Amino acid sequence: MKINACNWLLTLAVVFAATLTSAYAASRIKDVASLQSGRDNQLIGYGLVVGLQGTGDSLRSSPFTDQSIRAMLQNLGISTQGGDSRTRNVAAVLVTATLPPFASPGSRLDVTVGSLGDATSLRGGTLVMTSLSGADGQIYAVAQGSVVVSGFNAQGEAAQLSQGVTTAGRVPNGAIIERELPSKFKDGFNLVLQLRNPDFSTAVGMAAAINRYAAAQFGGRIAEALDSQSVLVQKPKMADLARLMADVENLVIETDAPARVVINERTGTIVIGQDVRVAEVAVSYGTLTVQVSETPTIVQPEPFSRGETAYEPNTTIEAQADGGTVAILNGSSLRSLVAGLNSIGVKPDGIIAILQSIKSAGALQAELVLQ
């Protein structure tokens, strides 16, 4: 029953992936490419989270937190000389955010905070004013607000219960943009579209779709595929650049991708693309289970003797071999490949080993990606 359920889930996952691949073969340019001049930028800052209920940094173990508290209070005009703080209501954190392209001053961003010291939870805390800088050292945003933590941590004298991560959280709309990134979009004459998944077929198809649009609107070609990732678009003399990009990004093109099998060995996840093919190959799979159990026996000394209580080790080892079924795999289609794998009756971890062996044998006509 468990094998049938496992097979059904694998079939459902792979067929669902194939359905998505077919459904999204035709996509808008905005969904598969982005402007080279309109990329995201990473911001980072160092700050303090206050208002924690005794779950912050211990100042002896995290001296940088103590230094930061004193520096913050001095900036606020409060003298800290001669004082010895023992609070655990403050935590030092790193604050990160992503600055989107064309973001204007006054806009807001979500920020992520993560503990640097030995704080046990950031739940209920408030991030105080923290400047966020880019790779050039310039300050582009300032963050402040209540920290939202998804996990929880509760403990007593003899037990502890935790779920999720409590030492990291988010501040929704917690950062205000103070500086605009320099952009040459309005003054540019040549724009470059970058494919998120590089592919020569998709790049050539994108250039052809843009040229068909340009021939109808401007009477000439304006796009050229530079390589598998980049498509150059030249602005016509009388065209408005914003209007041109609005029309171009809504053009529908046929996308393509190489055959690929993605395997995550930690979680047992397997994703098989629609174009994956397997040459005819025979596969035999068997599992060996070894179980070692320890049941020590307590030996008591005789009454009124000088002996001591001792124990005798008792080890039991059991080995069981399962499987050994031979199946012929010939993946002329995704459905036949999944049916062949399910016929062996193995679990996802076994299928991972089988796919790796088929690739080593040269029968898997696809790229094998291990995560």
From Swiss-Prot:
Question: One biological process GO term for this chain?
Answer: bacterial-type flagellum-dependent cell motility
Q: What is this protein called?
A: Flagellar P-ring protein
The UniProt function text for this chain reads: Assembles around the rod to form the L-ring and probably protects the motor/basal body from shearing forces during rotation.
Q: Does the keyword Signal apply?
A: yes
Signal peptide from the UniProt entry: 1-25
Q: What main location does UniProt list?
A: periplasm
**Keywords from the UniProt entry:** Bacterial flagellum, Periplasm, Signal
Q: Which domain of life is it from?
A: Bacteria
Q: How does it assemble?
A: The basal body constitutes a major portion of the flagellar organelle and consists of four rings (L,P,S, and M) mounted on a central rod.
Molecular-function GO term, any one:
structural molecule activity
Under Pfam families, the record lists: FlgI
Any keyword Signal? yes
Task: State the compartments where it is located.
Answer: Periplasm; Bacterial flagellum basal body
GO CC annotations on file = bacterial-type flagellum basal body, distal rod, P ring; outer membrane-bounded periplasmic space
Q: Which family does it belong to?
A: Belongs to the FlgI family.
The UniProt gene name for this protein comes to flgI
